[in-house]
Amino acid sequence: EILDIQEIAFNFLEIAKVRFPDELVSRYGDLDMSLKGHEILEEICIKKAWVQAGGIADHSRGASHVLDDFQQGRLGRITLEIPPEI
């Protein structure tokens, strides 16, 4: 099965907006955390000028950058794993 990078980024942003919103804001500027993941990605794309002809947000490029920022630690030392309760 082929994974859709945009769908992964949408889901990542859904988790990130709840678990580490400050890190997202620090990296991408003020974001409306009440939005859904795909809308947050749209907002990030517009802010970073990751747009296609006509000013349409380039979700593919934005998704790649957001996931790369997470993987490379540019969002900080964060993890998606939830520690077990003691």
Question: What are the functions of these language-model segments?
Answer:
Residues E1-I86:
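Helix-rich effector regions associated with P-loop NTPase G domains
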